[in-house]
């Protein structure tokens, strides 16, 4: 998955280069790195033929694969120093939110509460929970994992809100873990977020923490065409 991710990243960045001969020059240089990588990037850019490799200043030397150059392989399964966002609304289950927050903080994460109104929301126990951020201005991109805890009515309301749908859809697309209770399912459905091992029931705090410590790399080929 890491090679596909790298090739797709090169395609993404080079697609922003408007000058064709510059794109071709870079792909030509990639041939000195790896012929297969160059071909995948060329295909992703829609090139009909692989550009020629420029003369190498020094003859390329093949070296054995180094774990030190990996990203996924070196990624530590941890929540320490990371941040979990919990989306709530009026009527959200107080006990579920408390359990998720406790589990995330015990794992070393910071927890931020997100609500439609920055003033917070009144939970199922009748108490007002202040928010750290307003939903429209606090997208899931700022979190390492998210939880969505909503009442049935709250889920129906937020399933019609673009910011809420984007909150879960972007987290899913960025391969992040998502915890969701029954009320949140309406929002997930609106965002076309399906179940996988990284989308867990909000009551399963242990499963959520385990999933939140990493990214769901197996999800990526199901979401986008990789180079």
What label would you give each PLM region?
Residues 4-173, 186-227:
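Extended, subdomain-level signal for the structured scaffold at the beginning of enzyme domains
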Residues 174-181:
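ADP-ribose/adenylate-binding Rossmann-like module
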């Amino acid at each position: 998955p890491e090679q596909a991710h790298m090739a797709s990243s090169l395609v993404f960045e080079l697609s922003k280069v408007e000058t064709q001969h510059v794109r071709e020059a870079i792909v030509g240089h990639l041939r000195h790195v790896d012929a297969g990588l160059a071909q995948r990037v060329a295909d992703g850019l829609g090139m009909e033929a692989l550009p020629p490799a420029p003369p190498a200043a020094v003859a390329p030397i093949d070296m054995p694969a180094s774990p030190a150059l990996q990203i996924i392989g070196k990624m530590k399964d941890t929540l320490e120093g990371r941040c979990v966002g919990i989306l709530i609304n009026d009527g959200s289950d107080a006990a579920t939110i408390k359990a998720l927050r406790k589990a995330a903080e015990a794992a070393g994460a910071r927890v931020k509460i997100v609500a439609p109104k920055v003033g917070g929301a009144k939970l199922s126990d009748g108490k007002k929970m202040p928010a750290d951020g307003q939903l429209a201005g606090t997208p899931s991109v700022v979190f390492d994992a998210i939880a969505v805890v909503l009442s049935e009515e709250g889920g129906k309301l937020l399933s019609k809100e673009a910011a809420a749908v984007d909150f879960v859809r972007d987290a899913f697309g960025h391969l992040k873990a998502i915890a969701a209770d029954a009320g949140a399912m309406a929002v997930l459905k609106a965002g076309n977020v399906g179940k996988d091992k990284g989308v867990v029931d909000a009551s399963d705090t242990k499963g959520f923490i385990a999933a939140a410590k990493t990214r769901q790399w197996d999800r990526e080929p199901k979401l986008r065409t990789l180079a």
